[in-house]
């Protein structure tokens, strides 16, 4: 109920809706802090911004299926957001798995999305390239393949206008836009068409090996 109240409030107050999510797949690190958490908190304090921040715990299942790790990582990530100054009274802060409508929308979007669109996703293609020609899909789960689709549901569920992303996520935003445009063509102007925002100075944060 609170999410739809905020949706209409944002619409009538002519605010820009900005959505940011972080996958709780381990302990928070400097990349999370500098690339997503601090910029999102700063932006949420602006008067013309309706900020949506969430823990993408379903996405974390792609890399591991340990419920204890997912739970503890979610708590640690939430604590990191709050300790860095997130004001939950001015921001919609939620856990992905608490919003069942996201998975419902994920299914609906999957029914209008062609497989070829997801075949071109960089994460999937990179995983295939690492395998042999005889077994191109070895150890690749459907979660990885459908990752851009669930990300689309995350974004379109709340009609985000702006989605801050790293350079590696720009293609996923383009996929989201394609899906939203196709849905709107068939069913009317249901979804906003989101735009990616990339900070050129934070596109890549090099690790201690100088690579990643």
Describe the residue ranges of each PLM region.
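Non-catalytic terminal extensions that flank enzyme cores
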Residues: 1-25, 44-48, 79, 87-93, ...
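A generic signature of intrinsically disordered, low-complexity regions enriched in glycine/proline
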Residues: 7-12, 61, 158, 172, ...
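N-terminal Rossmann-like or analogous alpha/beta NTP/dinucleotide-binding catalytic cores
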Residues: 14-153
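Active-site cores that bind ATP or allylic diphosphates and position pyrophosphate for catalysis
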Residues: 125-212
């Amino acid at each position: 109920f609170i999410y739809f109240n905020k949706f209409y409030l944002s619409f009538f107050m002519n605010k820009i809706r900005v959505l940011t999510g972080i996958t709780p797949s381990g302990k928070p690190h400097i990349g999370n802090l500098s690339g997503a958490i601090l910029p999102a908190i700063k932006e949420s304090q602006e008067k013309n911004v309706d900020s949506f921040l969430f823990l993408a715990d379903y996405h974390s299942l792609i890399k591991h299926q340990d419920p204890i790790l997912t739970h503890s990582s979610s708590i640690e990530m939430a604590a990191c957001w709050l300790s860095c100054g997130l004001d939950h009274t001015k921001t919609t802060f939620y856990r992905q798995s608490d919003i069942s409508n996201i998975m419902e929308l994920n299914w609906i979007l999957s029914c209008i999305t062609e497989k070829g669109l997801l075949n071109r996703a960089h994460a999937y293609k990179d995983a295939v390239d690492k395998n042999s020609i005889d077994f191109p899909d070895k150890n690749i789960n459907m979660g990885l393949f459908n990752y851009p689709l669930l990300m689309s549901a995350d974004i379109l569920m709340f009609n985000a206008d702006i989605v801050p992303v790293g350079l590696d996520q720009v293609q996923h935003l383009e996929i989201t836009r394609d899906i939203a445009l196709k849905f709107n063509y068939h069913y009317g102007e249901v979804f906003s068409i989101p735009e990616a925002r990339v900070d050129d100075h934070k596109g890549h944060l090099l690790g201690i090996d100088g690579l990643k």
